[in-house]
């Protein structure tokens, strides 16, 4: 029997840090914390041989909370978003993948009032990926995928950002991933490389990633990103 598809659930926490709240004389009155929460429900389905489609429904919440002698308890904003994409392997004997995605489609994020609501960063992405190791060696269970991706703003098409990446996959049932990528300069980010690795063992997935360049807004380095998943 053909499976109906796959369903996934994930949660992401972005800790943006804390900041002291001070009076005019510099005395610490309290502490303000900044946290972003993202819950994702995903569904994927093979609609035709060599053609897959996927959909994400996301709930995003941004929280600014204050502890101590605060004028208010903070603010919270919640919004919803959708991602939708398709991936095709048009040639059965050629390890080539093509994909198109529209991401972060949803209502504005409102923290204070409607006039100050922020639109979501809706993006259009198109990518191509090719397995290159087959031209150099024939090691069972080892693949090297090279990917090129263009990303553009949905509301201001015409200035796409280019991303290049590679993923070395080793194993069959239990897998090891080694990843590297490079992205062009964009708003808030310097051009630079990223590295990462991942492990899939039985029902468990774990990944670690690090962007080597810092933010062009703060000058600080990017944090290490850690992900963990369980397949039921």
Located regions from the model:
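Outer-membrane beta-barrel porins/channels
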Residues: 1-232
